């Protein structure tokens, strides 16, 4: 397992101190959106792996949609096994380790939800991931917007509190995946600005403007005011 300065943020417990709930409140919301994306394309994977599964809530919530599938969550944070204990009877397996270094066959579907922005080298990660999945679902927070760049404080906040090292727009997120050998099947906004749980009163108020701006100006509206996230269904490009 890599022990670089970025990885140590998670293995040392620093991340857990700043984010003790591991964003568990968002898990059912994310699972619903993963299922909706897979369902529209008729995908029913028999094996599902989540890299960076955190407290495990996404996989546990997703299992009701695919009761016969094999579910495995991987994470490198040493404090997480105690949180996984409550899901012992859930039918989801959890592994403390790196999926890309683990033995075994490739998974039908790999979930990479809110992970790439934390990695020191997302290019290397994606290059290795291509041989370990048939399909992948990615979730990107779209931190970059005209407002966030002008204010800068929101970008510094997510860097310090939750460890975002890379910042994305829709176009930048898709470019990264394509440059690393993934074919984009569908990319959709999640409506996070006005549907995600655990939003503050200020965030709910701002969502009114964001929703209107997005409705009027599409992608440009998202780049102006921000507040959105992007979910992407992709698969590795087959080499000849």
Q: PLM features: what roles do these ranges have?
A:
Residues 120, 146-147, 195:
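Glycine/Thr-rich phosphate-binding loops of Rossmann-like dinucleotide-binding domains
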Residues 172-188:
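A SAM-dependent methyltransferase catalytic signature shared across enzymes that methylate proteins
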Residues 128-132, 139:
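Conserved helix-to-beta-strand junction in the class I
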Residues 139-164:
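Short, glycine-/aromatic-enriched active-site segment of Class I SAM-dependent methyltransferases
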Residues 1-106, 113, 123-128, 162-171, ...:
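Conserved N-terminal segment of class I S-adenosyl-L-methionine
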Residues 111-118:
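Short catalytic micro-motifs in class I SAM-dependent methyltransferases
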Residues 119-120, 133:
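Helix-to-beta-strand junctions that scaffold the AdoMet/dcAdoMet cofactor pocket
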């Amino acid at each position: 397992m890599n022990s670089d300065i970025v990885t140590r943020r998670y293995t040392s417990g620093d991340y857990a101190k700043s984010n003790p709930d591991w964003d568990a409140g968002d898990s059912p919301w994310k699972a619903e959106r993963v299922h909706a994306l897979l369902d529209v394309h008729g995908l029913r994977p028999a094996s599902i792996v989540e890299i960076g599964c955190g407290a495990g809530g996404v996989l546990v919530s997703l299992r009701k949609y695919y009761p016969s599938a094999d579910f495995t969550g991987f994470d490198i944070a040493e404090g997480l096994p105690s949180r996984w204990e409550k899901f012992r009877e859930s039918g989801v397996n959890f592994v403390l380790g790196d999926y890309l270094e683990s033995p075994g066959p490739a998974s039908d579907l790999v979930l990479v939800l809110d992970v790439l922005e934390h990695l020191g080298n997302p290019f290397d990660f994606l290059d290795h991931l291509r041989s370990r999945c048939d399909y992948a679902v990615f979730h990107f927070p779209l931190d970059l917007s005209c407002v966030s760049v002008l204010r800068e404080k929101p970008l510094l906040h997510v860097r310090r509190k939750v460890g975002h090292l890379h910042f994305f727009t829709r176009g930048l997120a898709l470019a990264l995946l394509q440059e690393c050998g993934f074919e984009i099947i569908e990319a959709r906004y999640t409506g996070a600005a006005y549907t995600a749980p655990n939003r503050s009163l200020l965030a709910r108020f701002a969502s009114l403007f964001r929703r209107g701006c997005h409705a009027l100006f599409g992608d440009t509206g998202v780049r102006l005011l921000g507040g959105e996230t992007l979910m992407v269904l992709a698969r590795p490009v087959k080499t000849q």
